[in-house]
Amino acid sequence: MTKVNSQKYSKALLEVAQEKGQLEAILTEVSEMIQLFKENNLGAFLANEVYSFSAKSELIDTLLQTSSEVMSNFLNTIRSNGRLADLGEILEETKNAADDMFKIADVEVVSSIALSEAQIEKFKAMAKAKFDLNEVTVINTVNEKIIGGFIVNSRGKIIDASLKTQLAKIAAEIL
């Protein structure tokens, strides 16, 4: 499925949820389904042509048992339009669209040593200002190869203040 098509489905779900005043509840359901898909590899199951439509449809019926009316209608639309193989991608796109709407993002901070809680709070504040976000979750990744400094990555926007990069720039200027 193209990104444009998954965006259309996710936009439709978000619009209906907003109209019905159930946006927060739907986003919770979407997050739970994404987690369920990851833990049980359901995306691969739905995309695999070896399994019959009826087997895949049984999975959707199981999901419908605990879904809200809005989510049930959405899942039935996906099923009737033959998009079960794309459901995982559509759910991810829905989460991304909602994160954009509410200016929420995960921010990866790569550093040569683990960050303290105080440093994490400073990176949250910096990321909110630099990337115009309302809510930030900092994910600290330790990579000793950057020598010192840090690299901040949020949705493809990168701030590279690592010592390794600075040394490489100096070396390029000298040569």
UniProtKB/Swiss-Prot annotation:
Molecular function, one GO term: proton-transporting ATP synthase activity, rotational mechanism
Pfam family, one: OSCP
Subcellular location: Cell membrane
Domain of life, per lineage: Bacteria
Ion transport in keyword set: yes
Predominant location category: membrane
Keywords, comma-separated and alphabetical: ATP synthesis, Cell membrane, CF(1), Hydrogen ion transport, Ion transport, Membrane, Transport
Role noted for this protein: F(1)F(0) ATP synthase produces ATP from ADP in the presence of a proton or sodium gradient. F-type ATPases consist of two structural domains, F(1) containing the extramembraneous catalytic core and F(0) containing the membrane proton channel, linked together by a central stalk and a peripheral stalk. During catalysis, ATP synthesis in the catalytic domain of F(1) is coupled via a rotary mechanism of the central stalk subunits to proton translocation.
Family, per entry: Belongs to the ATPase delta chain family.
GO CC term (a single one): plasma membrane
Organism: Lactococcus lactis subsp. cremoris (strain SK11)
Membrane-spanning intervals of the chain: none
Assembly: F-type ATPases have 2 components, F(1) - the catalytic core - and F(0) - the membrane proton channel. F(1) has five subunits: alpha(3), beta(3), gamma(1), delta(1), epsilon(1). F(0) has three main subunits: a(1), b(2) and c(10-14). The alpha and beta chains form an alternating ring which encloses part of the gamma chain. F(1) is attached to F(0) by a central stalk formed by the gamma and epsilon chains, while a peripheral stalk is formed by the delta and b chains.
Name of the protein this chain belongs to: ATP synthase subunit delta
Membrane protein topology class: Peripheral membrane protein
